[in-house]
Amino acid sequence: EDPVRFNLG
């Protein structure tokens, strides 16, 4: 779980 993925969500 990367921080960038959370941003995309």
Curated annotation (Swiss-Prot):
GO terms for cellular component: extracellular region. This is 65 kDa cell wall protein. Its main location: secreted. Keywords: Cell wall, Secreted. It is found in: Secreted, Cell wall.
